[in-house]
Amino acid sequence: MDSVNDSLVILDIKYWTNHNNKKIFDKNLMKFLKKDYFRKIPSTKHKDLPAIPFPNYHVCSNVKCSRLFDLRDNFVMSDYLKGGPKCPDCSRKSYPARFVVSCQENHLDDFPWRWWAHGKQDTECKGKLRLWSTGNTSSLDSLYVECECKKKKSLRGAMQDSSFENYKCTGNHPHKLNEKSNCNEPVIPLQRGASNVYFPALRSAIVIPSNASEDNNLDDFFTSVKEVINTYADLIGENWHYKFYSDRLTGHSEFSDAEDFIAKWTSYLNSNDSEEEIEYNQIKEAEYRAFTAFDRKVKMGDFEAEVETVPDDFQPYFNRIVKAHRLKEILVLLGFMRNDSPEPDVNEPKKIVWLESDGYENWLPAIEVHGEGIFIEFNHTTISKWLEENSELPKRSEKFSSLYASWIESKGWEVRDEKDIVYVMLHTFAHLLIKQLSLQSGYSSVAIKERIYCGKNMAGVLLYTGSTDQEGSLGGLVEMGSIDKLRPLIVDALEEAIFCSNDPSCASLEPSEDNQLNGCACFACSMVAETSCETGNRLLDRSLLVKTIDSKYSPFFKGLL
């Protein structure tokens, strides 16, 4: 992370001291991730997060000096806080070195400058290092690192894995402070600011209040005081609830007396004592039910939505259109990976570096995103009919499913959900509509996110945006959900997808690993920012929606355009 004067790494959550930050509760997400609660990430200037400089090696900005030094040598915190890193030779400002090294086990450490300068050999030499530039070109060939002992080497090849065959990983995790593990993996050179240095592992859920807001509030209350209640029960024994009620709950609006409290506490325990694991798809199923269960309007806590009338010409394709005036998403940071993206949609993704709390409490950092959205449920009957009438679709569906399964297995992950042609159709529709909405709603396509609901008895998409501000977003997106505005948006999005500026090349693409598991799709027609997409711009095919110049089957929206 770049700061004003330096590059920093935020320390693991066990080093955080902000224990007064708000606790966040979501029963399904907590059970899915096996956590007691989540804690809100501090966002004000009065609540800092602990961080350290990284990389440790810095370069003097004075080109006549160009000292390459380890900041940890003779480090003085007061001087560092005043003006950032300074050269130990000439006291000029210094900047963090451009290169670092990582490995497939997600370790991260400084580039081995001394090893490199001495001909890629281990050495006992402690001479001063300098990073010189010949100034001839901007390539690495023009840079070389030189030791005081006169050993020197050009940085040519410094970004090639093959240059580090004799150098093994140090097992370092800079965010864990002096914790190193034994690791013999070969290192991978990286640019310090490259996107593959850090891939966050995130899980999220749309908060769906229960039918009774009182029950929802009680769940949160009991979850927050569960440890205190257990302490009372252990210390006092029988009839502990009378003491707890008199000490802490007298006058509490949710409980009339101690007997009412113990009855509701017992009910809470009975509803939360299941040891059964929750899959991520079950969280989505609960969200899907919430969007499809009410008749006209619903307003419960942070969930406020209303149904739009589906026009006659849309009814063969859509069962329901919902304007979500108010949504709350809980976004949890599990940990991270380097060099590759984390495993999707599972509660314990493999190979990620998990954030570790201090041992006394089992939590993860999270943020609450308040926003708005548009939910569209597809017509299940039409989907079934479309699949039955096109003999080529089962083959294409199997192609997508097998490609996705092979990709998951190649990563060493477990195949949990089948991504068939219905998912690809829904996913592509979401992308096309995001691109069109960004032109009309006032939000860029980067700000609009998708949630795809596909599975048994599920076929829908949620497009939403939000902000960490309690007031949420500005209403521009949900306004586009009004049918008089949404109808032309959908039609325009589909018409734009018929032709691509990369046709005929794009239209002839077949599903393949070389094309990111996509069929007829590219950045010109179907792809959006990866922060908006559930699957990293994979599993897209516009030919499933509209007739392209190379279509081999009837598209889903055949009769609409």
UniProtKB/Swiss-Prot annotation:
InterPro entries: DrmB, MZB
Places the protein is found: Cytoplasm
GO biological process, one term: defense response to virus
GO cellular component: cytoplasm
Keyword annotations from UniProtKB, A to Z: Antiviral defense, Cytoplasm, Restriction system
Source taxon at top rank: Bacteria
Pfam families associated with the record: MZB (PF09369)
Main location per the UniProt record: cytoplasm
Role noted for this protein: Component of antiviral defense system DISARM (defense island system associated with restriction-modification), composed of DrmE, DrmA, DrmB, DrmC and DrmMII. DISARM is probably a multi-gene restriction module, this subunit has an unknown function. Expression of DISARM in B.subtilis (strain BEST7003) confers resistance to phages Nf, phi29, phi105, phi3T, SPO1, SPR and SPP1. Protection is over 10(7)-fold against phi3T, 10(4)-10(5)-fold against Nf, phi29, phi105 and SPR, 100-fold against SPO1 and 10-fold against SPP1.
Protein name, UniProt field: DISARM protein DrmB
Source species: Bacillus paralicheniformis (strain ATCC 9945a / NCIMB 11709 / CD-2)
Designated gene of the protein: drmB
